């Protein structure tokens, strides 16, 4: 027989809180690369050269640096500051996710990974104006109905259905 169910509550869909020896870095779109916005690849290379612990990717496409020792903590935090790896992003950007789509996926009907950051840029100005900057709003975009970025679980979803065309899904409470 099974044991009695233990009580639990879901308070967030985010990654675990940072504790001593652990740091979570948000990776927009889940791709570690250097871009105009952030130099993630360079920063993580520098961190990996001094860090002896673990790195792992979360279900939300973020990177956790685990096992940070007191010896390396100051240097790692310095690299994080140097490359602005903890920016004051909106709740929408923190909860955005897109599949790789074009040009990488043969099933893609339209773009998603390259388009979502631009869409979030546009929406952020409205969020700030409405006082919703810190609201944890999940937005997902996918290049086809297969839903690799889990758009059907998001509060705001764009599902590709043809070149430059998307079905828009919203959640109402």
Roles of regions detected by a PLM:
Residues 1-173:
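Peripheral terminal and linker regions in Fe-S/redox and tRNA-modifying enzymes
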